[in-house]
């Protein structure tokens, strides 16, 4: 479904820089630029693509659109109150940096916060993520990436409402949705994937990238790094003719 009525952006206050000024390195306004710089060096957010958002109680901090990720600073960060977003056609910001635009990823980040109570959501344009979606195009099941019996799977939780992490022998499943011309139009399909696969912490976007979330910045970052590792392993396995799903029996 194409976006026909763009969301109206409103700023409540003209002087709200106090929301992004902090000496604490763990403050969201400091963490987001640091994360984006790290992701840029990994090749995940090339050419201003991708983004990150952190929720701290009711405040949501968002990376802007169009800023080189390795050059991002705290003053570039948008801030909104998640409880003030009552009209889907209007997004109210507590802080909007001058001469910048909000990220088109914003409604997808908000879906992770409202539907999964996430503390952080990351969007990358990782080449490995894109390659996985391309490999799946010619597979019998094109809408699900599945892999098991790889140690790094242990980095993922069992599900939003479950305790503990997946084990070595468990199968990690990441749904795939089709890309759309406009990023915000992905929102309804991301939400559908969340509803259909409630245990997932990520959604792949065909020929585009991946969205990954977690209950904290640490968890989201850990899962994003682990997922990229697994995507790369899976691409190399495909080259060698090795299956992503294998029947490895547990050692007694």
Swiss-Prot record:
Zn(2+) binds at residues 123, 125, 208. GO terms for cellular component: cytoplasm. The keyword Metal-binding applies. InterPro entries: Aldolase_II/adducin_N, Aldolase_II/adducin_N_sf, MethylthioRu-1-P_deHdtase_MtnB, Salvage_MtnB_euk. Keywords: Amino-acid biosynthesis, Cytoplasm, Lyase, Metal-binding, Methionine biosynthesis, Zinc. It holds the Pfam family Aldolase_II. This is Methylthioribulose-1-phosphate dehydratase. Binds 1 zinc ion per subunit. It comes from Sclerotinia sclerotiorum (strain ATCC 18683 / 1980 / Ss-1). It catalyses: 5-(methylsulfanyl)-D-ribulose 1-phosphate = 5-methylsulfanyl-2,3-dioxopentyl phosphate + H2O. Belongs to the aldolase class II family. MtnB subfamily. Catalyzes the dehydration of methylthioribulose-1-phosphate (MTRu-1-P) into 2,3-diketo-5-methylthiopentyl-1-phosphate (DK-MTP-1-P). Its cofactor is Zn(2+).
């Amino acid at each position: 479904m194409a976006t026909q009525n763009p969301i109206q952006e409103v700023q409540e206050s003209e002087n709200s820089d106090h929301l992004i000024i902090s000496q604490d390195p763990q403050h969201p306004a400091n963490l987001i630029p640091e994360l984006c710089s790290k992701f840029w060096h990994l090749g995940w957010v090339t050419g201003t693509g991708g983004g990150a958002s952190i929720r701290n109680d009711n405040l949501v901090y968002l990376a802007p659109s169009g800023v080189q990720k390795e050059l991002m600073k705290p003053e570039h960060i948008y801030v909104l109150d998640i409880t003030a977003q009552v009209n889907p056609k209007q997004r109210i910001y507590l802080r909007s940096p001058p001469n910048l635009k909000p990220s088109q990823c914003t409604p997808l980040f908000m879906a992770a916060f409202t539907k999964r109570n996430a503390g952080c959501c990351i969007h990358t344009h990782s080449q490995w993520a894109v390659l996985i979606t391309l490999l799946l195009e010619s597979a019998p099941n094109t809408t699900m990436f599945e892999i098991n019996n790889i140690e790094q799977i242990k980095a993922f939780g069992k599900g939003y409402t479950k305790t503990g992490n997946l084990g070595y022998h468990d199968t990690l499943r990441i749904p795939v949705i089709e890309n759309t011309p406009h990023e915000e139009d992905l929102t309804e399909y991301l939400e559908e994937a969340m509803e259909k696969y409630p245990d997932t912490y990520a959604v792949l976007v065909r020929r585009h990238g991946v969205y990954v979330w977690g209950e904290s910045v640490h968890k989201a970052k850990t899962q994003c790094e682990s997922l990229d590792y697994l995507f790369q392993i899976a691409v190399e396995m495909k080259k060698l003719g090795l299956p992503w799903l294998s029947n490895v029996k547990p050692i007694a």
